[in-house]
Amino acid sequence: MNKVNICVIGLGGVGGYFGGKLAHTFSSNSDSSANVFFVARGRHLEAIREKGLIVKSPEFGTITCTPTLATERISELPQIDVFLITVKGYDLTEASISMRDRVGEHTLILAPLNGADIQEKLRITVQGGIILPSCVYISSYIEKPGVIQTGKPGKIIFGKDPLHPDDTPYELFRLFQKSSIDYEWKEDANPAIWEKYIFIASFSLISAYYNRTLGEILEKPSLKKEVIAIMNEIKSIASKKKIQLPDEIVDLSVKKATLFPPDTQTSLQRDLSQKKDKSELDLFGGTILYLGKEVGISTPTTGKIYQELEKISSSLGTPEVSG
């Protein structure tokens, strides 16, 4: 039986957790039915090469995960059977172009990023393989180079590729089960993806624009109103695209925010407030505007916030909040 070749591109909080569990199962231990390759860069890659990837979690304590190979160049790898792409949205195009030569007809591709149209973007650049729409729920981050700290067990939700409706990835189920990865398989994963997107995009845009935590947004009626307006714009787009969401999805999404610590910041908020060179602003605001235009849905609140955030990202300041 041939080994399954698994490649994890991006070893941040998400890739480090799921990739770490895969490597710990198949590369670090006696199970030799799969090779697990890591694609990373910089000091993080150097630390992984030197000491392995260390993953710390209340779920399993501390484990050291040694991949078959950790590299910066996908060109060094063999043909890949399973790609797990866990880069930031702004690095997706570069990652997908770099992996094209390692994608075969039956290669499985999961990219559980925060966007609503990730599979469509991948389809344009990869032009092959079986792309399984997916999203994740996890709290995890790089504590320092080579070390991942996680909270509760992460979960990945994925479903069938619309272009390959007869293909069910039973081998991937086996890999996840052996690695104790919590997953949920759906015939159609798009509702789950959009349910997450409606929450994360709206709160990301408002938190970044006003530089306010989730708790502060919920406490201020004016900010909460804008969050709900963006949610309704996304909901209308989803409806036009025949994505089946619960009628009460907006209320459910607002209630979900109350489950987070009040001082929670979004990653977009942190990136813009820290004036980082790159952010996922386009993944949230830009995507809503583009998809709204595509299906004929007006997105005035998103449009206003997105334009102002582009100014903020150019270091023009943060607006005052009233109400």
Task: Kindly give the residue locations of the regions a language model identified.
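Internal alpha-helical scaffold of NAD(P)-dependent oxidoreductase catalytic cores
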Residues: 26, 101-102, 125-130, 145-196, ...
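Short, charged/polar "capping" segments at the starts of alpha-helices
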Residues: 44-47, 119-120, 166
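Residues at the C-termini of beta-strands that transition into short coil/loop
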Residues: 40, 59, 72-74, 113, ...
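Short, well-ordered alpha-helices that flank and scaffold nucleotide-derived cofactor binding pockets
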Residues: 20, 24-28, 97-101, 124, ...
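NAD(P)-dependent Rossmann-like dehydrogenase/reductase catalytic/cofactor-binding core
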Residues: 2-4, 34, 177, 228-323
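A structural signal for isolated positions on well-ordered beta-strands in alpha/beta enzyme cores
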Residues: 7, 35-37, 110, 157, ...
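NAD(P)+-binding Rossmann beta1-loop-alpha1 motif at the extreme N-terminus of oxidoreductases
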Residues: 1-61
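Rossmann-like NAD(P)(H) cofactor-binding subdomain of soluble oxidoreductases
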Residues: 62-147
